[in-house]
Amino acid sequence: MTSIYTSDLKNHRRAPPPPNGAAGSGSGSSSGSGSGSGSGSGSGSLTNIVTSSNSLGVTANQTKPIQLNINSSKRQSGWVHVKDDGIFTSFRWNKRFMVINDKTLNFYKQEPYSSDGNSNSNTPDLSFPLYLINNINLKPNSGYSKTSQSFEIVPKNNNKSILISVKTNNDYLDWLDAFTTKCPLVQIGENNSGVSSSHPHLQIQHLTNGSLNGNSSSSPTSGLSSSSVLTGGNSGVSGPINFTHKVHVGFDPASGNFTGLPDTWKSLLQHSKITNEDWKKDPVAVIKVLEFYSDINGGNSAAGTPIGSPMINSKTNNNNNDPNNYSSAKNNVQEANLQEWVKPPAKSTVSQFKPSRAAPKPPTPYHLTQLNGSSHQHTSSSGSLPSSGNNNNNNNSTNNNNTKNVSPLNNLMNKSELIPARRAPPPPTSGTSSDTYSNKNHQDRSGYEQQRQQRTDSSQQQQQQQKQHQYQQKSQQQQQQPLSSHQGGTSHIPKQVPPTLPSSGPPTQAASGKSMPSKIHPDLKIQQGTNNYIKSSGTDANQVDGDAKQFIKPFNLQSKKSQQQLASKQPSPPSSQQQQQKPMTSHGLMGTSHSVTKPLNPVNDPIKPLNLKSSKSKEALNETSGVSKTPSPTDKSNKPTAPASGPAVTKTAKQLKKERERLNDLQIIAKLKTVVNNQDPKPLFRIVEKAGQGASGNVYLAEMIKDNNRKIAIKQMDLDAQPRKELIINEILVMKDSQHKNIVNFLDSYLIGDNELWVIMEYMQGGSLTEIIENNDFKLNEKQIATICFETLKGLQHLHKKHIIHRDIKSDNVLLDAYGNVKITDFGFCAKLTDQRNKRATMVGTPYWMAPEVVKQKEYDEKVDVWSLGIMTIEMIEGEPPYLNEEPLKALYLIATNGTPKLKKPELLSNSIKKFLSICLCVDVRYRASTDELLEHSFIQHKSGKIEELAPLLEWKKQQQKHQQHKQETSDTGFA
């Protein structure tokens, strides 16, 4: 199939004599007049004489049988369904054995064999010369059956077309390859719109040796290249075209290898236990597993690699990656990441979920150089204000060219200089037009400087005096760490000059990628009031003070994280607008500087602790981004701004979409405050020991001090360390709204400060089902298994009736108490289905318990929990889930391909439990049982018992407690 023959290319034109010297008819024309006069000879292995008067050139009964060489490698054959587009036959599909040879397309009622003596079996029922094919129209997802693929052969004489339906997609592609090989000049595509010899699944190029070019259809001899060699015998004519078959990612059945694989995928396959037999068995499943793993590391799941991390930047699905950049070290890191992905997230590995990047180096863009330079001066030497505006002009001219990496977000702010407040601009993109923006900024700034000089000549002396007074006042504010309106105004206004920010922010904050606090919106409102003061002549400074008090007052109620997100959502500090409103901004308000500044001091005291915290974060943000958004040349405090454009450029569109879909920090804090208790929980509880960890935090055993030392479980979560904070709110809301005897009871929740969350739950003394299985030597009888499944099913039924999917059912998340009660916990991955979205398609959970539809990235519903319950049942039978000893990539492949896992010793189990497993682990979701059906199953109805019968499983726990108590008493006696 990889050879192209001159006779195939030029059957529709005058052809040279064949190698055996037989005279060719040579009368066939490309017009396809319907005379049926093609070349009368072919290769030695095939002879075709078309004698029918049919306008198609097709004969139903040949006077001379076609001689077939069944073992020829140039032949594609197989069973298909055929019909034409006639009025009476368009609804009938006839099953035929189709064979494409060098010259004809033949259809047989039965498979032809050259070895038997029956000549009728080798007589085609229908024969179609290849030179009469005008084009081939693809009709995917249509045909004889629902899974069939079809294509239409259109003849040149505008007669009836032939529709051919192929059963499988692989056969469909093979046939298209065969037609591409035999008829390279025939157009193949949907609705005759495709390019020559192409179909939607393949990218095919024909590389000629020089003579065959785009004008080959008009030149009768253009198809004959210098490399064409005529040979005798059965080999025919050698191929004049170097045929290449390129696909994005494909599988070559001949070699048994994948084609077009990215280097990262190749490395994963080489280091995995997926064998060549696995590849040949189901190559589509291998590709699905690789895509699944890539999406997990691309941030599509809760445990995925975060945005902006180096892991994502090295993925092959990014548009800007280079396959040559993949090294073995990176591949090893990705393997290790896959190994870590199946483990519960530990607090020590939290840093891998944060975007890590180095702080950009100076020089900074033009309108930010003065800010950064003055900020460093201020930090190191308590600061000093420039003596005149000339310094600003000099620095502006010096740094005017340093705008190559300025994001359009900053330039957009300069375009709207006269607007004090506006909606958040779009996410920053590549700053390719920075030069244009910088030139415009320079022109606008030059015009503004001239205008300011004209209006301020008369007040220069007063300005100098006020500046000295302002500096003294600023030093006082620095010692008190006041909350000044650091986001807006020029440095010439004492109201807008903040204290020196301490440089105690550790550099690790910048590297960890934490979003820093930004108190922007209260000051934004203050600036609006100030601008109104400037624009209205009848407004005095007291009105500005009142506005400042009014808008700063609620600021104390907001947390650091809410301010952080607001800074990223409203990255428009009004200092640039304030500075460029009018010259009165920098000079006209000097007389009111005392009254403007003093009212701010009383507000600073209650906010002082928050401000101390945020000042460090602002320092780290400056180190992280290296770019500030305000063009004010002397403002020393405009640091908490939107992120720099550098890291944002590396984000893919998919990641940005995920970011927009997530709750921002302000919404998260607001939502948390409606759920949690604002009381300090530390005086209420006494932590005893660490009990374990879940998907979103550590769990501690504690005692309630005011409730007779009642034992409870406290789940502590650091909000700053959570990659997706909305999952935490999701977990709290589900537990709070899902009060059930088979779900771990939610007691209360507390938010300490602005980043530490405590969730109080009932304590399950028996521990997890995993511990019970391990400490009982994997000897759970069927009655105990049925009882645990029964209790778990009741909890799942309650969730599913609320249209909630747990999505992480496994033995680690099923707990028992001292009385044998079985309860479900860890709702960090749960999801709620709605009428608008009654199926999910995200990839969360633990791989070994995942349903096949999740691994294959198909839509799923509540029945994924039923599959996980079946895997958990196998855990109780065999001590571990299937494929646990396989490395994760191979396990994902086996889940996707094997379907229902096999039991190690099924002969030891009863029929009822095997039937129970069969309907839990049914690959076809339509036939998989629901929780309601499972509760009515005979295994649950007849085998399950009372929860008290589970008490023997907890004997190991009692023995462990006695041993610890004895050890404690011994140690106390020794000290005594």
From Swiss-Prot:
Pfam families named among the record's database cross-references: PBD (PF00786), PH (PF00169), Pkinase (PF00069)
Residues binding ATP are: A691, G692, Q693, G694, A695, S696, G697, N698, V699, K715
- The reply to whether Cytoplasm figures as a keyword in the UniProt entry is no
Q: Spell out the PROSITE patterns in the cross-references.
A: CRIB (PS50108), PH_DOMAIN (PS50003), PROTEIN_KINASE_DOM (PS50011), PROTEIN_KINASE_ST (PS00108)
Q: Which family does it belong to?
A: Belongs to the protein kinase superfamily. STE Ser/Thr protein kinase family. STE20 subfamily.
Q: Tell me what this protein is called.
A: Serine/threonine-protein kinase CLA4
Q: Name one GO cellular component term.
A: cytoplasm
List the catalysed reactions. Answer: L-seryl-[protein] + ATP = O-phospho-L-seryl-[protein] + ADP + H(+); L-threonyl-[protein] + ATP = O-phospho-L-threonyl-[protein] + ADP + H(+)
Q: Where is the composition biased (Basic and acidic residues)?
A: 441-455
| Source species of the chain | Candida albicans (strain SC5314 / ATCC MYA-2876)
Q: At the top level of its lineage, which domain of life is listed?
A: Eukaryota
Q: What happens when the gene is disrupted?
A: Leads to defects in morphology and hyphal formation, impaired chlamydospore formation, reduced colonization of the kidneys in infected mice and suppressed virulence in the mouse model.
**What residue stretches are annotated with the Protein kinase domain?**
685-940
| Domain PH residues, every copy | 73-184
Gene expressing this chain: CLA4
